C-alpha cells in the first residue's frame, strides 16, 4: 500500500515541478513582452527622429546650395566687372 502512496506523491511532485517551471516560463515571457514593447517604442521614436533629421538636412542642403549659387554669381559678376574695367579703357584708348 505504501507503493501507490509514493507514486501519488511522486506524481504530485512532478506536477508541482512542472507547475513551477511553467510559472517561471510565463514570468519570463511576460518580461520579454515588456522588453519588446519598450524596444518597439524606442524604435518608433528613433524612426521619427530620423525622419526629422532627414527633413532638416534636406532644408540645410537646399539653403547651402542657394548660398553657393549666390556666391558663385557674385564672384562671376566681380570678375566680369573687373574685366570690363580693365578692357574698356584699353579698347577706348586704341580706337
Swiss-Prot record:
CDD domains: R-SNARE (cd15843). Keywords: Coiled coil, Cytoplasmic vesicle, Membrane, Transmembrane, Transmembrane helix. GO terms for cellular component: plasma membrane; SNARE complex; transport vesicle membrane. It is found in: Cytoplasmic vesicle, Secretory vesicle membrane. Induction: Regulated by the srfA transcription factor. Gene3D superfamilies: 1.20.5.110. Residues 7-67 form the v-SNARE coiled-coil homology domain. One of its GO terms (molecular function) is syntaxin binding. PANTHER family: SYNAPTOBREVIN FAMILY MEMBER (PTHR45701). This is Synaptobrevin-A. The lineage of its organism: Eukaryota, Amoebozoa, Evosea, Eumycetozoa, Dictyostelia. The gene is sybA.
Amino acid at each position: 500500500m505504501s507503493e501507490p502512496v509514493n507514486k501519488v506523491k511522486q506524481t504530485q511532485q512532478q506536477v508541482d515541478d512542472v507547475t513551477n517551471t511553467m510559472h517561471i516560463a510565463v514570468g519570463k515571457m511576460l518580461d520579454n513582452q515588456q522588453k519588446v514593447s519598450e524596444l518597439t517604442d524606442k524604435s518608433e521614436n528613433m524612426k521619427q527622429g530620423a525622419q526629422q533629421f532627414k527633413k532638416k538636412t534636406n532644408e540645410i542642403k537646399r539653403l547651402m546650395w542657394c548660398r553657393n549659387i549666390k556666391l558663385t554669381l557674385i564672384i562671376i559678376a566681380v570678375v566680369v566687372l573687373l574685366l570690363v574695367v580693365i578692357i574698356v579703357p584699353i579698347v577706348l584708348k586704341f580706337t
